Amino acid sequence: MRLSPDQTRVILQCVRQQFGADVGVMLFGSRLDDGARGGDVDLLVESPSPPSLLQRARATMALEAALNLPVAIVVTQRGTPGSAFARIARSQAQWLEVPA
C-alpha cells in the first residue's frame, strides 16, 4: 500500500470528520500496488446513512488539500450491495486503520 502512516491518519480523520465516526474507510485502486507510481487516492467509504453531496465535496476538497494528491471517494450505505462499481472496488479494497 502506497500510503504513509501520516497519510492514513489524515484520511481517516478527514473522512470521519465529514461523514461521522462510525464510517469504514477502504483503499482501492493503484495505491494498493507497491510497484506502481503516482495515481490518485481511491477511497470506498461505508456509511450507516447516505451522506449528502455537500459532505462528499467537502471531504474530497479537505483530503486533496491535506494530501496534495487527487482523491476519488465512492460512498456506499452499510448493509446494501451498492453499485456494480462499488462491489468491484470492495472486492479489491483494503481497510484503512489508524497506524500504531
Which ranges hold each PLM region?
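Catalytic core of pol beta-like nucleotidyltransferases
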Residues: 1-26, 32-38, 47-100
